[in-house]
C-alpha cells in the first residue's frame, strides 16, 4: 500500500507538536538517566586511562628493548659464533646496524670502568639520556649548574618602584677584584691604640700601659726604655687625634670652642639654638658673648654696669651686622631686646664723628630714632641715656603732648641722638625748629605699628628730608663693609638705615625697598609669633558681668602678683573696668588715647614704681611699653587682630622671664579664632582648649570683608585708642 503523503505530513506535524510541548519526566526517571550518564562518563574516563597506560607501557618497553640491545654488544664480551660469511649473506639490515653499533660500543667501552658495571650502567645511561632529552626540549639547556638564590636576601619585584637601600655582604665585589683586600692584616705598632675610626676610647690608655709593662718584663735590658717610648708615642698620638677631632668640629660643643676653632657646622648649630635666620650677602657670623662683639671696651664696661650678662638672640645677630655699617631689617618677637641691639652700634658709629660744637650743633643730630608712640619714645630715651650719658652724648626726645617751645628749648644746645614720634618730628621740621643736615644714622622701631597708626606719609617726608650726599649706592658695594665704613671727602660717612619690626606687611616692605640699600634681614624665631616664655590660656566667657566675675576670681586666687595689665578694646571700658578692679581691693590706673601726655607718664610711672598694682589699657600700651616683671596679662576683650594680640601678651615674659596671658573669648571674636588656634598650637607651653579646637570659626581662615581691607590699606589702625 503506497504511503500517503498527507498522512506523513500529519504524523510529522503531530510529532513536532509533541516535541515542542514540555514533557514531564518523573523523579525516578530523572535519577535513572542521571545515573546512566554518570556511569557512562566514568567508563569513558577508565577506558581513556587504560589506553594511556597501555600506550605508556608499550613506549617504555620499546625504549627498554632498544636500550638492552646496546650493552650486550658493547660490554666487552665475545660475539656469538656464526658460520662462514657465505652462509650469512642473508643478514637483514638489523644485523648490519648491530655490527655498526658494536664498533661504537667498543669506543664507548674504553671510557667505562669495567665489565662488572656494564648492563646496569648502560641501562641507567639510557634513562638519563631520555630524561636529558626531555628536559632539554621542555626546559631548555642547563646553563647555571649552581643557584645563587638566598632566602635571607630581599627579592625585588619587577613592579616594585621603591629603591632598596639595604646592602648585603655578598654584594661586595671589591674583595674579588682588588688584591689589597686579600692581604688584610691586623696592624699593631707602637702608639696605635686607637679604637674604631681612630678615636681614643676610655680603655686606650690602659691597653697602652699593659703593653708597655709586658715589654718591660720581657726585655730586662732595654725594656724600660722601650716602654717609656711607647707611652710617649701614645700620648702624642692621642693629643693629635683630639686636635684633629676638634678641627673637624666633632670634639666639643660650640660653647667650649675658641672663636678660631668655630666651623661652619658650629655656626649652623649656634643659629639653630637661638632661632636666628639671616638673609643677604656677606653677613658676618653672630657673636657668642659680649667679649666677642668687637664693641669698644668702654661700651662693654657700660653693658656690664647696666647688668646685661648674656646678649639676646637679636643682639647676637644684629650687632655684628650693624658694626659693619650695613643696612638692616630686624624681624623679632616683642620683648626680645631690640633697643640695645640698635643703640650699641649707633654709639660706636657716632663715636667716630666730630663732636658737636658751636658751629655744627645747629646742623641737627647725627642719629634719628623714630617710634610710633610717646611711651615707647620715652622708654627708648631712658635706655639710650644709660649708654650715651657716660660717653658724653646728649639724647633728646620729641613727642606730642608737650609744648613745642619746651622741646625747642631742649634742642638749643644740640643733640647727637634724637628720639621722636613721626608726627611731632615732622611738625618740628616744617616749623624749622629742627634740621637733618648731618643725620647719618636712622632707626625705625616698630615700623609696622607706625604704618598702622597712619604715619606712612610722615615717615616718607622725614626720610626725604635727609641729605642725599651720603646716601648708599644700590649696588653690591652696599654689602661691602670696608667701602661702607669709608669717609666721604672729609667727615661724612655713608648713611646707615635700620628698621625693626614684628611683622612685614606690604607697606613696610615698600618703605624698606625705597630707603634701605641691600639690607641684611635678621629674623628671630617666626615673625608674628609670641615668645615661648608666655603661657597662653584661653577661656570662653561671654558677657561683661561674667567676665568681671571671672577677673575677680583670677585676681583673688593669689597666683599672680603685681604689676598686672588688663587690656580692653574701647576707651570707655577702661574706666569702668578700672573702677570694678578698685572695688575688688586692687589699685588701678588707666592708659588710653584720651589721656594727656602728663597723665600717661604718671600712670606708667606709678605702675613701674610699684605704687599701682593693675594697669587697664587699650592697644596703646600693647606695643613697646616695657613695664618690668609683669606677671599676668588679661585680655578682657580679645584683640581685633592677631598682631595686636601678640603684642599684648608680649608685655609679660620679657627679658627671659616667664609670664601668663589669659584671654576671654566670646561669639564676637569669631574672626580671630582661627589665627588664635594656630598661634596656640605653635607654642610649646600653651594648650588649645577643646572648645576652641572644635569651634566652627576655628576650622578655616576667615575671608576678610571689603570694608576692613580698605581700612587696613589706608593705614588707619586703632589710632582712636
UniProtKB/Swiss-Prot annotation:
Helicase C-terminal domain ranges (all copies): 533-696
Catalytic activity: ATP + H2O = ADP + phosphate + H(+)
Gene that this polypeptide is encoded by: PRP28
Residues where ATP binds: 332-339
Positions with biased composition (Polar residues): 64-77
Keyword Amino-acid biosynthesis part of the UniProt annotation: no
Function statement: ATP-dependent RNA helicase involved in mRNA splicing. May destabilize the U1/5'-splice site duplex to permit an effective competition for the 5'-splice site by the U6 snRNA, resulting in the switch between U1 and U6 at the 5'-splice site. May also act to unwind the U4/U6 base-pairing interaction in the U4/U6/U5 snRNP, facilitating the first covalent step of splicing.
Protein name (database record): Pre-mRNA-splicing ATP-dependent RNA helicase PRP28
Stretches with biased composition (Basic and acidic residues): 26-63, 88-104, 688-698
GO molecular function: ATP binding; ATP hydrolysis activity; nucleic acid binding; RNA helicase activity
Amino acid at each position: 500500500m503506497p504511503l500517503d503523503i498527507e498522512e506523513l505530513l500529519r504524523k510529522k506535524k503531530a510529532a513536532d507538536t509533541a516535541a515542542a510541548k514540555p514533557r514531564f519526566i518523573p523523579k525516578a526517571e530523572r535519577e535513572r538517566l542521571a545515573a546512566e550518564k554518570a556511569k557512562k562518563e566514568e567508563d569513558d574516563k577508565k577506558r581513556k586511562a587504560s589506553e594511556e597506560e597501555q600506550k605508556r607501557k608499550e613506549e617504555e618497553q620499546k625504549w627498554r628493548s632498544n636500550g638492552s640491545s646496546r650493552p650486550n654488544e658493547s660490554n666487552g664480551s665475545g660475539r656469538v659464533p656464526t658460520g662462514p660469511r657465505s652462509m650469512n649473506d642473508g643478514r637483514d639490515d638489523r644485523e648490519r646496524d648491530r655490527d655498526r653499533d658494536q664498533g661504537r660500543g667498543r669506543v664507548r667501552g674504553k671510557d667505562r670502568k669495567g665489565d662488572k658495571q656494564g648492563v646496569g650502567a648502560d641501562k641507567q645511561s639510557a634513562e638519563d639520556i631520555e630524561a636529558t632529552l626531555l628536559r632539554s626540549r621542555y626546559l631548555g639547556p642547563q646553563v647555571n649548574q649552581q643557584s645563587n638564590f638566598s632566602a635571607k636576601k630581599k627579592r625585588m619585584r619587577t613592579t616594585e618602584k621603591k629603591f632598596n637601600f639595604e646592602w648585603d655582604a655578598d654584594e661586595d665585589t671589591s674583595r674579588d677584584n682588588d688584591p689589597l683586600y686579600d692581604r688584610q692584616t691586623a696592624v699593631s705598632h707602637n702608639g696605635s691604640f686607637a679604637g674604631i675610626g681612630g678615636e681614643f676610647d676610655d680603655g686606650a690608655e690602659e691597653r697602652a700601659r699593659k703593653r708597655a709593662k709586658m715589654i718591660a718584663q720581657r726585655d730586662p735590658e732595654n725594656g724600660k726604655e722601650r716602654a717609656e717610648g711607647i707611652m710617649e708615642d701614645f700620648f702624642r698620638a692621642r693629643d693629635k687625634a683630639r686636635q684633629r677631632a676638634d678641627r673637624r668640629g666633632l670634639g666639643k660643643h660650640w660653647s667650649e670652642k675658641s672663636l678660631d676653632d668655630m666651623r661652619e657646622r658650629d655656626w649652623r648649630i649656634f643659629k639653630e639654638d637661638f632661632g636666628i635666620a639671616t638673609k643677604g650677602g656677606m653677613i658676618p657670623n653672630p657673636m657668642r658673648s659680649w667679649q666677642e662683639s668687637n664693641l669698644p671696651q668702654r661700651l662693654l664696661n657700660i653693658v656690664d654696669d647696666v647688668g646685661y650678662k648674656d646678649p639676646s638672640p637679636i643682639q647676637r645677630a644684629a650687632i655684628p651686622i650693624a658694626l659693619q655699617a650695613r643696612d638692616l631689617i630686624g624681624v623679632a618677637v616683642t620683648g626680645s631686646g631690640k633697643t640695645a641691639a640698635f643703640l650699641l652700634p649707633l654709639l660706636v658709629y657716632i663715636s667716630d664723628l666730630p663732636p658737636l660744637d658751636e658751629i655744627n650743633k645747629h646742623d641737627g643730630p647725627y642719629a634719628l630714632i623714630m617710634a610710633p608712640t610717646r611711651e615707647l619714645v620715652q622708654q627708648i630715651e631712658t635706655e639710650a641715656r644709660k649708654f650715651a650719658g657716660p660717653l658724653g652724648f646728649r639724647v633728646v626726645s620729641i613727642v606730642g603732648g608737650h609744648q613745642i617751645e619746651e622741646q625747642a628749648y631742649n634742642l638749643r644746645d644740640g643733640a647727637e641722638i634724637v628720639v621722636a614720634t613721626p608726627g611731632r618730628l615732622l611738625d618740628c621740621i616744617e616749623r624749622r625748629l629742627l634740621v637733618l643736615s648731618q643725620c647719618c644714622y636712622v632707626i625705625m622701631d616698630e615700623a609696622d605699628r607706625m604704618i598702622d597708626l597712619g604715619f606712612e606719609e610722615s615717615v616718607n617726608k622725614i626720610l626725604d628730608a635727609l641729605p642725599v650726599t651720603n646716601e648708599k649706592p644700590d649696588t653690591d658695594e652696599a654689602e661691602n663693609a670696608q667701602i661702607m665704613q669709608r669717609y666721604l671727602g672729609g667727615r661724612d660717612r655713608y648713611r646707615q638705615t635700620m628698621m625693626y619690626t614684628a611683622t612685614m606687611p606690604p607697606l613696610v616692605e615698600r618703605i624698606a625697598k625705597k630707603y634701605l640699600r641691600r639690607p641684611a634681614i635678621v629674623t628671630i624665631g617666626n615673625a608674628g609669633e609670641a615668645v615661648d616664655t608666655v603661657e597662653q590660656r584661653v577661656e570662653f566667657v561671654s558677657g561683661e558681668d561674667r567676665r568681671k566675675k571671672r577677673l575677680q576670681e583670677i585676681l583673688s586666687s593669689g597666683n599672680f602678683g603685681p604689676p598686672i595689665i588688663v587690656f580692653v578694646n574701647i576707651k570707655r571700658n577702661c574706666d569702668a573696668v578700672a573702677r570694678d578692679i578698685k572695688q575688688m581691693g586692687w589699685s588701678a590706673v588707666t592708659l588710653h588715647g584720651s589721656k594727656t601726655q602728663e597723665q600717661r607718664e604718671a600712670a606708667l610711672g606709678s605702675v613701674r614704681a610699684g605704687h599701682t598694682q593693675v594697669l587697664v589699657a587699650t592697644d596703646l600700651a600693647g606695643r613697646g611699653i616695657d613695664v618690668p616683671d609683669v606677671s599676668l596679662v588679661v585680655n578682657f576683650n580679645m584683640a581685633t587682630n592677631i598682631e595686636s594680640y601678640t603684642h599684648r601678651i608680649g608685655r609679660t615674659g620679657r627679658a627671659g622671664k616667664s609670664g601668663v596671658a589669659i584671654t576671654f573669648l566670646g561669639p564676637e571674636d569669631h574672626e580671630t579664632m582661627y589665627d588664635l588656634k594656630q598661634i596656640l598650637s605653635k607654642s610649646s607651653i600653651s594648650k588649645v582648649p577643646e572648645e576652641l579646637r572644635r569651634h566652627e570659626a576655628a576650622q578655616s581662615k576667615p575671608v576678610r570683608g571689603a570694608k576692613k581691607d580698605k581700612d587696613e590699606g589706608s593705614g588707619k589702625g586703632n589710632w582712636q585708642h
